[in-house]
Structures are given as structure tokens and as C-alpha cells.
Amino acid sequence: MSEELVPHPNESLPGPRASPREVWKKGGRLLSVLLAVNVLLLACTLISGGAFNKVAVYDTDVFALLTTMMLLAALWIVFYLLRTARCPDAVPYRDAHAGPIWLRGGLVLFGICTLVMDVFKTGYYSSFFECQSAIKILHPIIQAVFVIVQTYFLWISAKDCIHTHLDLTRCGLMFTLATNLAIWMAAVVDESVHQAHSYSGSHGNTSHTRLNPDSKRAGGAAEEDPCLCSTAICQIFQQGYFYLYPFNIEYSLFASTMLYVMWKNVGRLLASTHGHGHTPSRVSLFRETFFAGPVLGLLLFVVGLAVFILYEVQVSGERGHTRQALVIYYSFNIVCLGLMTLVSLSGSVIYRFDRRAMDHHKNPTRTLDVALLMGAALGQYAISYYSIVAVVVGSPRDLQGALNLSHALLMIAQHTFQNVFIIESLHRGPPGAEPREMPPKEPCQGITFANLDAIRTLPSCPPTPRLVIPNLESPQEAVAIISAPRCHWRRRCLKDISLFLLLCNVILWIMPAFGARPHFSNTVEVDFYGYSLWAAIVNICLPFGIFYRMHAVSSLLEVYVLS
């Protein structure tokens, strides 16, 4: 083993285990992962325990832990920006694939919405601050500071390959990642309990309630509780921050993915030509497309918004209206999922005629994208298979059951074919990677050294070639760079497919993220599995399905740019 650590004197490039720093690389990663796992498990224990009345863990305990974690993470970020990143040769390389502009732009957008949510949350708890714990008012303020500091940090440092304070940086990145995941889980649990509370209010189920004030958690009656949100402004603040939870959830997940890529890049050595092949050129939206994909995608987006609003209005009304709302909701989703499946399949077929080379270079960002796409899809797979079993085994053969079954089957097919299309697209080289064949019938294609008068006499050449004269003293000899770039039909089709799938994934993210829960409005699964089991399945799996949609949007935007 010791002989393997000694580099041969004639070797120009040492192996990965030659340097003692590289030997400790895995140990430093293991230490940071263990730190993140333990912190995250502690946070998950408190968050899950605070969601139920029968567990003696209060929401103030959860807020105190999250506030402490955000303060520590913000302090480390400040140390990184002021000390670590300013060391000599601290960042010798920058990963061109990490932190693309659309990912950082999405992070800023979701961060702004999170700041608005923190303002609403502060106003909500300040409406009855006399009987509230100070930590409830302090928590959204600290979260706003943390969001600002972290967003600035990721905007300027997402591409860093840091080579200073390696172990401290790894631990700091993993701790910050664990903090974001804890915030994500707290938001998901709070939103899920809020949805369960709405369901129990109309069906008499009391196994779940919202995170209540401490006096009520301690056993006080609701009528005697002075900490009630009774004013109009308090109701606005309460409803406002619940509707902004989806943006907070996506912000935490976006930040977590960028932090993981930074963690993978700590101490990474890059070649001087890294990223040159995949640097996207300046593009404009809808350029070099057939417009069919954007138009059809926008049409489905607008129709989906109308269906979502109609569903939310009717599902809270009479029972007959709920059934009608479910039929409309499932019908739209079946049409949308069916079109997305066919379009994804056609994109994979188009790649069979694509001559671009496959990109097999090491790329932590792409590896993470593929893993997240495959992993997040498992949540929707689980819900779909549970629905299929409930419909086939236990439900009567009616229209609602048929729509539910078709929706579940198409959901599985759509996720599968879309993942295949996106993953294959991410592994394709840029358009310039196509092998260029120079047929003998077109001698003027490419770069030709020739006499200018002879070039003008060729009938098959373009009328206005671009000439570059390397030496003014010999004007008769020149370099004629005659480029005839044309956008192939398959490239246009791929751009249309990417935009269509992007818009469809946005509307399919909006519906469940902002409260559409046909899983509970449709009583097939609730009657078959029971409310407690079905609620656990949906509340665990649905957040991954929601994250899948937004992550697919990010990946499809990259596919569009690189097409």
C-alpha cells in the first residue's frame, strides 16, 4: 500500500493518491458528511416531533434550533468570503459547469419570494406578540438575513474550486447544506399539517393539527386562548406566508444543490481547457424554433391555470362540485401528461439521428442533476403505484376511477420518458461537436488557402464569402473562411420540445405546490388505505414530486440552451 503512495520519478502526472492532501481528501469528505448527517437527523427529529400535539416538542424548540443553525451557517459564510476566499491562490480554478446563470437567477427569484414570506411571517407573529415567544418573531428575521447572505455567497462563489482551508470549507458547506434541508423539511411539514388540518376540519379527523401556540399545546382550550388570529391584517399575513411556502421550499432545494456541487469541487484540479466545449453561446428565447412548442406550451399553461383556479373554487364547495372539479382536473392532467410523453419519446427518437458526440467528461453538476431527476421521480412513482392498486382492487368501476387510473399510468410513463430525454440531452456535446464531413463536391466548404481570382470564378461558392487576409503584402493569397451554418431541422425540433416540456412542467409544479390535493378530494385511496396511511404516503412522497417538476424545468432550460 505504501508503494502506491510514492510517485514514480518519471511520471509527469501523479496519480490521485500521490499527494498527502489527496490521501486525506476522502477523510475530509467523510468527516463533513458525518457532521451533516448528525445535524440533519437532530433537526428532523425535532421537526417531525413538533408536528403532533401528543409529542412534547413545541414549535418554539424547532424555531430555536433552526435559528441557531442559520446563524452558524451565516457566520461561516462571512468567514469564507472575508478570509478563506481572499487567501493567495485560494481559488485557482472555477468550474464552468457549476452554477449556471439560470440556476442562480432562479435562486435569486425564490430568495426574493422567501424574503416576502419572512415579512408576512413576522407580521403574523407580531399581531399578538404579547403572548408569543420571542423566538417566533426572531426566527423569520434571522431567516431573512440568512437568505440574503447565502444568496450573495452562491451568486459569486458557486463556481469556486477552493484550495484553502479544505476541511473547514467542506464542513462549512455540508453544515449549510444540512441547514437548508432542515428549513425545507420544516416548511414541508408545516404545509402538510396545514393541508391535513383543512381536511380534518371538513371530515372530523383530528389526528393532525397545525403547529399551535404554546398555550394550546399545553392543554388550554381554543375558546380561552388569547393568541388567536382574529384581525383582518393578521389573516392576510397568515394566508400570505402559507401561499409563499412553495418558493421557500424551492429556494432551499436550489441552494442545497449548488452547495453540494461546491462541496464536490473543494480541492478539485481542472485542466486548462475545462468547460470550453460546453460554453453556451448567446441565445434568445424562441430563436431558431418552429414556434409550435412554445405556442402549445403557453396554451396548456394558460388552460392549466384556469383549471387550477376552477378546481380550488369548486373543491371547497358542495360535494357535487368536488366531483366535477376532479373530473376536470384529471382530464386536463391526462391530456397534458399524454402530450408530454409523446413529445419526450419523439425527442429520444430524434437523438437517434443526431451525430453529436457524447460528452463523457467528469461533471459533478451533471451527475447531481441526473441523480436528482431519478431520485425525485421515485416520489411520484410511489404515489402512482399506490393509486393503481387502490383503483384496480378496491374502487367501483366508474368515470372517476377510470380517470384516476389513467392519470397514474400516464404519470409513470411521462416521468420515465422525460427522464430519458433529459439525461440523454445533458450527455450530448454542443452543436459544434458534430463531425464535419467535407464532401468532394463542395471544395469551398471550410478553410481554404487559394487565389482570390480563382475563388471568384467558382460557381458553387457563396456569393459573399468572408475573407481574412493574414498578410497585407501578398493580397493575392488569403484565407477564405466560408461558413454556411444552418440550423438543422432536428435542432429546431429539440428546442421546441425543450420549451414545450418546460412550460408543461411549470404548470404541473404550480398545481400541487399551491395547494391542489386531489389525493384527498378523491376518496378512493383514502377509503382503501385509511386516512392515516394515505396521508403519510402523500406527505412524504409529494414534496419529492413537486421538487422534480422544478428541477426538470432547470434541466430543460439547460437542454434548450445547449441544443
Curated annotation (Swiss-Prot):
<keyword id="KW-1003">Cell membrane</keyword>
<comment type="similarity">
    <text>Belongs to the otopetrin family.</text>
</comment>
<feature type="transmembrane region" description="Helical">
    <location>
        <begin position="173"/>
        <end position="193"/>
    </location>
</feature>
<dbReference type="GO" id="GO:0005886">
    <property type="term" value="C:plasma membrane"/>
</dbReference>
<keyword id="KW-0812">Transmembrane</keyword>
<keyword id="KW-0813">Transport</keyword>
<feature type="transmembrane region" description="Helical">
    <location>
        <begin position="325"/>
        <end position="345"/>
    </location>
</feature>
<feature type="transmembrane region" description="Helical">
    <location>
        <begin position="373"/>
        <end position="393"/>
    </location>
</feature>
<feature type="transmembrane region" description="Helical">
    <location>
        <begin position="30"/>
        <end position="50"/>
    </location>
</feature>
<dbReference type="GO" id="GO:1902600">
    <property type="term" value="P:proton transmembrane transport"/>
</dbReference>
<feature type="transmembrane region" description="Helical">
    <location>
        <begin position="403"/>
        <end position="423"/>
    </location>
</feature>
<keyword id="KW-1133">Transmembrane helix</keyword>
<comment type="function">
    <text>Proton-selective ion channel open at neutral pH. Actives at neutral and alkaline extracellular pH, likely participates in some alkali-related physiological activities.</text>
</comment>
<dbReference type="Pfam" id="PF03189">
    <property type="entry name" value="Otopetrin"/>
</dbReference>
<feature type="transmembrane region" description="Helical">
    <location>
        <begin position="496"/>
        <end position="516"/>
    </location>
</feature>
<dbReference type="GO" id="GO:0015252">
    <property type="term" value="F:proton channel activity"/>
</dbReference>
<feature type="transmembrane region" description="Helical">
    <location>
        <begin position="528"/>
        <end position="548"/>
    </location>
</feature>
<feature type="transmembrane region" description="Helical">
    <location>
        <begin position="100"/>
        <end position="120"/>
    </location>
</feature>
<keyword id="KW-0375">Hydrogen ion transport</keyword>
<keyword id="KW-0407">Ion channel</keyword>
<feature type="transmembrane region" description="Helical">
    <location>
        <begin position="290"/>
        <end position="310"/>
    </location>
</feature>
<keyword id="KW-0406">Ion transport</keyword>
<feature type="transmembrane region" description="Helical">
    <location>
        <begin position="137"/>
        <end position="157"/>
    </location>
</feature>
<feature type="transmembrane region" description="Helical">
    <location>
        <begin position="242"/>
        <end position="262"/>
    </location>
</feature>
<protein>
    <recommendedName>
        <fullName>Proton channel OTOP2</fullName>
    </recommendedName>
</protein>
<dbReference type="InterPro" id="IPR004878">
    <property type="entry name" value="Otopetrin"/>
</dbReference>
<feature type="transmembrane region" description="Helical">
    <location>
        <begin position="62"/>
        <end position="82"/>
    </location>
</feature>
<keyword id="KW-0472">Membrane</keyword>
<feature type="region of interest" description="Disordered">
    <location>
        <begin position="1"/>
        <end position="20"/>
    </location>
</feature>
